[in-house]
């Protein structure tokens, strides 16, 4: 790969990184305006990440156009820090979300979830009283449970439905309780349950109570968070590949000259030619 080809890669990788950052910011803003408070609280890190990546790209672009070795050094240093942070977070995300899955029940299409199946990190976060009060408030306001009776008119429809983890865990008692369903959001609690599961006593038909204090509800939230984290981890892998391409291509150019410093100056000169077409770059 020649110098021109490598510099071409740097320019286009920077452009792709900037476009990716803009897309991340737009997605974060969209999430903050089209979702309830439960998910909206997760959008700030998304917007912040997009803004930070955009800032890095601007630093690299200005460093090349203004022939500033200092800016290019800053660009490389910050880019390396971001790469390490993304790598660490992605590895931790895959480790934390490795455990936990749904359990099938005869006659039901949807799965049920058990809190102890998930990682100790999830258990610590969801068993924290202040955290759960906040999450429970969001779940009640979202009225997902109230909407079940409108979505599924009959018990047969409910049993054949693919309920979300939160609907399955927070809106109904665990199947082992044995409470007969009157409709999709109301159960006959006069039935004497022989199950030792404490969730059976915690469930109430009241809209603000349901099974929001149950471990099954926390397990449903854990499964939801696991899915979200996996998506973020996959996105981070793509982002890592894009950023590492930028770092490696910059390093390759640096190795073509008499050391990293001269390499950075050479990159800035070549890129400066595109930014200032009337200026003849100095040849090294």
Curated annotation (Swiss-Prot):
<comment type="similarity">
    <text>Belongs to the tetraspanin (TM4SF) family.</text>
</comment>
<feature type="transmembrane region" description="Helical">
    <location>
        <begin position="229"/>
        <end position="249"/>
    </location>
</feature>
<comment type="function">
    <text>May be involved in the regulation of cell differentiation.</text>
</comment>
<dbReference type="GO" id="GO:0016020">
    <property type="term" value="C:membrane"/>
</dbReference>
<keyword id="KW-0812">Transmembrane</keyword>
<feature type="topological domain" description="Extracellular">
    <location>
        <begin position="97"/>
        <end position="228"/>
    </location>
</feature>
<feature type="transmembrane region" description="Helical">
    <location>
        <begin position="44"/>
        <end position="64"/>
    </location>
</feature>
<dbReference type="Pfam" id="PF00335">
    <property type="entry name" value="Tetraspanin"/>
</dbReference>
<feature type="topological domain" description="Cytoplasmic">
    <location>
        <begin position="250"/>
        <end position="284"/>
    </location>
</feature>
<protein>
    <recommendedName>
        <fullName>Tetraspanin-10</fullName>
    </recommendedName>
</protein>
<feature type="transmembrane region" description="Helical">
    <location>
        <begin position="12"/>
        <end position="32"/>
    </location>
</feature>
<feature type="glycosylation site" description="N-linked (GlcNAc...) asparagine">
    <location>
        <position position="128"/>
    </location>
</feature>
<feature type="topological domain" description="Extracellular">
    <location>
        <begin position="33"/>
        <end position="43"/>
    </location>
</feature>
<feature type="glycosylation site" description="N-linked (GlcNAc...) asparagine">
    <location>
        <position position="183"/>
    </location>
</feature>
<dbReference type="InterPro" id="IPR018499">
    <property type="entry name" value="Tetraspanin/Peripherin"/>
</dbReference>
<keyword id="KW-0325">Glycoprotein</keyword>
<dbReference type="GO" id="GO:0009734">
    <property type="term" value="P:auxin-activated signaling pathway"/>
</dbReference>
<keyword id="KW-0472">Membrane</keyword>
<feature type="topological domain" description="Cytoplasmic">
    <location>
        <begin position="1"/>
        <end position="11"/>
    </location>
</feature>
<dbReference type="InterPro" id="IPR044991">
    <property type="entry name" value="TET_plant"/>
</dbReference>
<feature type="glycosylation site" description="N-linked (GlcNAc...) asparagine">
    <location>
        <position position="99"/>
    </location>
</feature>
<feature type="topological domain" description="Cytoplasmic">
    <location>
        <begin position="65"/>
        <end position="75"/>
    </location>
</feature>
<feature type="transmembrane region" description="Helical">
    <location>
        <begin position="76"/>
        <end position="96"/>
    </location>
</feature>
<keyword id="KW-1133">Transmembrane helix</keyword>
């Amino acid at each position: 790969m020649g110098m021109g080809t490598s510099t071409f890669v740097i320019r286009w990788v920077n452009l792709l990184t900037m476009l990716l950052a803009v897309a991340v910011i737009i997605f974060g803003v969209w999430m903050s305006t089209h979702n309830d408070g439960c998910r909206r609280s997760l959008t700030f890190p998304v917007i912040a990440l997009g803004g930070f990546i955009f800032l890095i790209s601007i630093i690299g672009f200005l460093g090349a156009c203004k022939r500033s070795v200092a800016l290019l050094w800053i660009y490389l240093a910050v880019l390396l820090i971001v790469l390490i942070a993304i790598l660490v977070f992605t590895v931790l995300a895959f480790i934390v979300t490795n455990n936990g899955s749904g359990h099938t029940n005869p006659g039901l299409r949807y799965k049920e979830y058990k809190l102890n199946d998930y990682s100790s990190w999830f258990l610590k976060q969801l068993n924290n009283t202040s955290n759960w009060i906040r999450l429970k408030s969001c779940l009640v306001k979202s009225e997902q449970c109230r909407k079940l009776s409108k979505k599924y008119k009959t018990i047969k429809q409910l049993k054949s439905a693919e309920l979300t983890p939160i609907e399955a865990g927070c809106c109904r008692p665990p199947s082992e309780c044995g409470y007969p369903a009157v409709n999709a959001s109301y159960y006959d609690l006069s039935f004497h349950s022989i199950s030792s599961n404490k969730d059976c006593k915690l469930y109430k038909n009241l809209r603000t109570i349901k099974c929001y204090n149950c471990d099954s509800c926390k397990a449903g939230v854990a499964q939801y968070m696991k899915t979200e984290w996996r998506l973020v981890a996959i996105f981070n892998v793509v982002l890592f590949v894009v950023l590492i391409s930028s770092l490696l291509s910059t390093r390759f150019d640096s190795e073509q000259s008499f050391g990293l410093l001269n390499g950075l100056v050479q990159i800035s000169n070549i890129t400066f030619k595109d930014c200032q077409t009337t200026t003849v770059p100095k040849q090294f």
